[in-house]
């Protein structure tokens, strides 16, 4: 791919390449492709020139190809916005260099244990390597990712209580049953699945 070739010629291509006026990154365990494609569609319908890695090539070579597609042959930016779908594990190799204006996080869940370990590990990767200057758009219903980048500008989104929601964890895997601040058992006003829902700590 163009990204592989560019990285062989210039390993720090992502850091050196010119940036579009608007850069949006989307990461998370699930829903990255859908979310980034929706954002791209909205921007295009608004009349903006946009490039994105629509097919889900979301590690370093794919994101590098995305940058190449945003440039003319002479290296000038030819788009109004670049949208990156970013693999959550590879975010440490991408976010510091593309320097997003906005980072959208869909949520963090258990994935392949061999690859991603625990959601807390992926949390630490994103929290450490996302530039503080990025405006962060977070899933308020997902307890792990909603705590990202506490010192950055943050906006939250979520879905209100639904008729089939529960009040107690019912999955075999429930990663967040205790408060990350004090260790008290969390009380769920409603719970959709895993740890998606509206939780509060009765102690702090």
Residue ranges: model-predicted function:
Residues 197-198:
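Intrinsically disordered, low-complexity regulatory/activation regions of eukaryotic proteins
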């Amino acid at each position: 791919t163009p990204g592989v070739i560019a990285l062989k010629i210039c390993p720090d291509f992502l850091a050196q390449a010119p940036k579009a006026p608007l850069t949006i990154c989307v990461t998370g365990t699930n829903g990255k492709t859908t979310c980034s494609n929706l954002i791209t569609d909205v921007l295009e319908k608004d009349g903006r020139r946009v490039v994105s890695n629509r097919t889900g090539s979301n590690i370093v070579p794919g994101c590098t190809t995305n940058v190449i597609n945003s440039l003319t042959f002479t290296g000038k930016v030819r788009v109004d916005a670049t949208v990156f779908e970013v693999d959550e594990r590879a975010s440490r190799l991408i976010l510091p260099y593309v320097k997003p204006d906005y980072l959208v996080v869909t949520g963090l869940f258990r994935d392949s244990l061999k690859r991603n370990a625990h959601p807390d590990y992926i949390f630490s990767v994103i929290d450490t390597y996302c530039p503080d200057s990025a405006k962060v758009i977070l899933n308020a219903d997902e307890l792990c990712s909603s705590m990202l980048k506490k010192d950055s500008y943050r906006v939250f989104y979520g879905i209100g209580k639904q008729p089939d929601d529960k009040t107690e964890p019912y999955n075999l895997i429930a990663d967040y049953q205790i408060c990350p601040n004090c260790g008290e058992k969390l009380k769920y006003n409603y719970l959709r699945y895993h740890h998606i829902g509206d939780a509060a700590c009765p102690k702090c």
